[in-house]
């Protein structure tokens, strides 16, 4: 039997097996005994037999072990290796068997088997990898879902806190409603009389001379809630002139037209409080053919047609007494004698020494014994146009100092008139002052050279006008001050004197009225003439030059500005004069004016169409953990609360500061604030103090509105033009905005919105209004659907966070009379232009003068002023350029308040991702804005914009606070 060989791992037979029983290291000798050989062969045969019996299980066990090790090795390698390593075969497989000892067929089968194993393992590994990636994706999704749920939890918790706060606020409002003990005032309802005036006995001239409002006026026809109804006798149907006289056709037509625009006029005489009778200017029929405003005669070669003052009155008193509603004594009648073409005393005071009984006389010229203070009314002559813009008649306000310090042109008529010693001394001193050796220039002429337009014919002495209207206008434009001499013979007012005041104010020459303590000026009950003119007694004539030099530029420009405002509002036109007369009489009686008309809103949708709604995106613009305020139902601002007190307590402000006593407004930005303790002691209604009065940081701040005024909300007005998707995105971002009352979308396009357009449901009403036409002025229309004082004007592409909006709202509540907003701009002086002009500038600057209304809060009061008070030329310029409406609003507010706007937060511009390119990025846009600023300055007569060098941020911004406290706003 051949010897057995041990097969090593290398597959090589290197040594015969030891068959000896000793188990030594040496080989057996060839001469061993046969017994030993047999014993050895038997043992080997038995061992081989046992080996063959367990060979197959052992091989299988070994293969299983090898496969497990191989799989473990591959998996451990695959986890760290790139995917390409999966297809590589491990070199360890080569070490398990000696493939060189195998036959080719077995080797091929072995290779195929290993390939199959590899393929199977690769498939399993790919499945495991795919499963692992899916698990990782699921884990990532679940983690994201967890974060979303956490955010949702925070939002819900914040919403819950807001709801709790809202419930508390609602409970407070309920308690206030229960405890309310004052009437809830609203728009007044008219309480009108329904009968004609009762017949009374006529009164004598002596009794008429002592008439005052308490003994000659019937208050029973003028209820506080009547609205002051006024009836006009048609001058064509109820003429009160003598034969041969008639009223100028221009005056009759214009008066009826202007009164037709007045809200107080009624057609039914039964409802009237007062009755207007036009008694003048009455001229001879031949004089009506003349066109010269100041002519009293025909040409010089013609015979004068002047009636005497005593025996020829152009008013037929019997016709006056026979008016259908005269009532026997003329109670509640107003006699209008408006001078226009003839300014001489005999024509402008036809009612002198006539018994007008209880009727109120309204005219320019009064004798001292004729005028009844507090009853009769002095008005300026009608020297202007019927109405409309009058800014072109005025001169620029700057520079403060003009060529001449003081000017006067006049001549005493009739020439044979004599002066008293004081008046003669005044003229002598003025002549010496004009000849004095000073650098100041004077024009003081007391004789007309060349001859005046005004011819002889006045029987009463007075200082007549020299030259033509254009020559006087040019001189006054070069005058810093204009001297006004009083009428002679102790008259309290004359038409010529008032004409001088009219012309001086129109040209920006500050009137210096000598003898003002002896005179009565127009509307003196309401207009504060001390803010418009220098009122001096005659005794101050020797100190006149010193006083004029003592006036500083700021005071001089303030006088000039106030004079122009008074002229524009109360003197400039027939419309202004008539409206002021009615307002003055109404003010005497303490009756509120008519409510200012609002623009009736017209929806773009018809009454049957219901627009589609969509859920708005939630949580895009606000931090979920920041509570900005409670959720409240819509709460309109209380309106018309001060109907019967504002003109009693703030009449001077209404007439001289706001310059608008003609309308009653729902609210004013000038309404007074209560003392701090009043909100806790008896006047708590509506107030929501921080921490119920204890104050606090961010948490308490977010729960209450606080401040110095009762709770209120704001309305967003958004102008849009054919940018539906941009509009929808902007509306969606307003969801959940605290203190938002309503959104008003002004649809400026002639095309209606698409029927399938989905409007986001943001929790408050969204009114989509049809604009009358495509105009940027529509942004500031005072729509009746705007029911709050605060109005946030925004562009449809402005992107504002909720905290920014609310901070701006809170700041506006402390600056209600100003523009409060985000993007700041300024007007810069063009140094390269020798004539000087303004440039609009949007660069970053430490000083600004405008806040653009593309994102700004304004009071609704300014919407009324922009629509009804702002000169039409400015609104026309806005339409011409389709630009500059925001500049116009800044001009208006600064003009009224003399204050700059307030900028909030650090935002300078507003980027709208994905929005179409706006017009503001065009260079033409900026060139037009340069022109707008300079044009608006010419219209106003000066540039009312004022500079500011600070912006507003919240109190605790960038302040270190304890960890258990919150800031007012996280990012502001």
From Swiss-Prot:
It is a single-pass type II membrane protein. The keyword Endoplasmic reticulum applies. Glycans are attached at residues 218, 606, 643, 843. Disulfide bonds join 884-932. GO terms for cellular component: endoplasmic reticulum; endoplasmic reticulum membrane; Golgi apparatus; Golgi membrane; membrane. Belongs to the glycosyltransferase 47 family. This is Exostosin-3. It comes from Drosophila melanogaster (Fruit fly).
């Amino acid at each position: 039997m051949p010897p057995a060989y041990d097969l090593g791992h290398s597959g090589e037979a290197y040594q015969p097996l030891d068959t000896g029983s000793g188990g030594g290291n040496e080989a057996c000798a060839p001469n061993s005994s046969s017994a030993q050989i047999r014993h050895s062969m038997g043992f080997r045969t038995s061992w081989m037999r046992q080996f063959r019996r367990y060979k197959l299980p052992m091989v299988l066990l070994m293969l299983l072990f090898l496969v497990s090790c191989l799989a473990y090795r591959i998996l451990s390698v695959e986890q760290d290796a790139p995917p390409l390593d999966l297809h590589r075969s491990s070199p360890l497989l080569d070490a398990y068997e000696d493939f060189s000892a195998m036959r080719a067929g077995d080797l091929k089968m072995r290779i195929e088997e290993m390939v199959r194993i590899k393929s199977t393992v690769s498939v399993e590994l790919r499945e495991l990898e795919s499963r692992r990636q899916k698990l990782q994706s699921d884990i990532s999704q679940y983690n994201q879902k967890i974060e979303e749920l956490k955010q949702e939890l925070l939002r819900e918790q914040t919403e819950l806190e807001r709801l709790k706060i809202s419930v508390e606020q609602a409970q407070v409002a309920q308690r206030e409603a229960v405890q309310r003990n004052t009437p809830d005032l609203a728009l007044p309802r008219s309480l009108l009389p329904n009968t004609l005036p009762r017949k009374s006995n006529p009164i004598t001239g002596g009794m008429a001379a002592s008439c005052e409002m308490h003994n000659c006026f019937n208050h029973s026809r003028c209820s506080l809630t009547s609205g002051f109804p006024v009836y006009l006798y048609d001058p064509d149907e109820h003429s009160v002139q003598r034969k041969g006289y008639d009223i100028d056709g221009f005056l009759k037509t214009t008066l009826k037209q202007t009164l037709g625009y007045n809200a107080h006029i009624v057609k039914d005489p039964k409802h009237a409080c007062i009755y207007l009778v036009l008694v003048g200017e009455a001229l001879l029929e031949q004089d009506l053919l003349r066109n010269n405003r100041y002519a009293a005669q025909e040409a010089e070669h013609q015979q004068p047609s002047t009636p005497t003052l005593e025996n020829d009155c152009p008013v037929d008193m019997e016709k006056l007494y026979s008016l259908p509603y005269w009532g026997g004594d003329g109670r509640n009648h107003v006699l209008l004698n408006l001078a226009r073409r003839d300014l001489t005393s005999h024509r402008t005071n036809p009612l002198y020494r006539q018994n007008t009984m209880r009727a109120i006389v309204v005219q320019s010229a009064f004798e001292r014994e004729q005028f009844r203070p507090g009853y009769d009314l002095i008005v300026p002559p009608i020297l202007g146009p019927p109405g409309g813009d009058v800014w072109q008649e005025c001169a620029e306000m700057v520079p403060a100092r003009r060529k001449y310090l003081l000017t006067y042109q006049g001549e005493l008529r009739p020439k044979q008139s004599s002066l008293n010693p004081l008046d003669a001394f005044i003229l002598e001193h003025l002549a010496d002052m004009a000849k004095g050796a000073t650098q100041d220039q004077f024009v003081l002429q007391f004789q007309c050279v060349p001859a005046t337009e005004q011819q002889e014919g006045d029987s009463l002495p007075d200082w007549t006008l020299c030259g033509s209207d254009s020559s006087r206008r040019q001189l006054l434009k070069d005058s810093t001050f204009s001297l006004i001499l009083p009428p002679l013979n102790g008259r309290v007012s004359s038409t010529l004197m008032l004409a001088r005041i009219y012309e001086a104010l129109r040209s920006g020459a500050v009137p210096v009225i000598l003898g003002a303590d002896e005179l009565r000026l127009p509307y003196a009950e309401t207009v504060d003439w001390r803010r418009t003119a220098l009122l001096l007694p005659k005794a101050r004539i020797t100190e006149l030059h010193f006083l004029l030099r003592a006036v500083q530029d700021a005071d001089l420009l303030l006088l000039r500005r106030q004079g122009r405002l008074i002229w524009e509002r109360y003197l400039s036109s027939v419309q202004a004069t008539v409206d002021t007369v009615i307002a003055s009489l109404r003010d005497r009686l303490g009756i509120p004016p008519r409510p200012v008309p609002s623009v009736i809103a017209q929806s773009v949708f018809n009454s049957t169409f219901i627009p589609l709604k969509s859920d708005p995106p939630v949580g895009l613009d606000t931090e979920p953990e920041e509570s900005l305020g409670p959720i409240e139902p819509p709460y309109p601002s209380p309106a018309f609360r001060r109907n019967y007190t504002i003109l009693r307590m703030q009449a001077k402000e209404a007439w001289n500061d706001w310059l608008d006593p003609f309308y009653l407004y729902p609210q004013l930005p000038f309404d007074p604030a209560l003392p701090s303790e009043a909100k806790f002691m008896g006047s708590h209604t509506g107030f929501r103090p921080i921490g119920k009065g204890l104050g606090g940081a961010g948490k308490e701040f977010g729960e209450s509105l606080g401040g110095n005024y009762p709770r209120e909300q704001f309305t967003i007005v958004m102008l849009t033009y054919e940018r539906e998707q941009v509009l929808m995105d902007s509306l969606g971002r307003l969801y959940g905005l605290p203190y938002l009352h309503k959104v008003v979308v002004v649809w400026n396009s002639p095309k209606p919105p698409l029927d399938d357009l989905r409007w986001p449901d943001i929790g408050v009403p969204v009114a989509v209004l049809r604009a009358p036409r495509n105009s940027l002025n529509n942004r500031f229309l005072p729509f009746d659907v705007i029911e709050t004082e605060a109005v946030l004007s925004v562009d449809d592409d402005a992107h504002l966070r909720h905290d920014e909006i609310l901070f701006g709202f809170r700041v506006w509540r402390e600056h209600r009379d100003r523009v409060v907003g985000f993007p700041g701009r300024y007007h810069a002086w063009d140094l390269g232009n020798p004539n000087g002009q303004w440039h609009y500038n949007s660069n970053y600057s430490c000083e600004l003068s405008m806040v653009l209304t593309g994102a700004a809060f304004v009071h609704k009061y300014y919407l009324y002023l922009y629509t009804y008070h702002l000169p039409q030329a400015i609104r026309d310029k806005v339409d011409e350029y389709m630009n500059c409406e925001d500049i116009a609003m800044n001009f208006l507010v600064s003009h009224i308040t003399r204050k700059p706007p307030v900028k909030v937060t650090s935002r300078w511009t507003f980027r709208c991702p994905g929005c179409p390119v706006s017009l503001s990025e065009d260079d033409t846009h900026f060139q037009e804005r340069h022109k707008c600023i300079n044009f608006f300055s010419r219209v106003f007569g000066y540039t009312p914009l004022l500079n500011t060098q600070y912006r507003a941020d919240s109190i605790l911004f960038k302040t270190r606070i304890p960890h258990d406290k919150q800031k007012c706003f996280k990012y502001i």
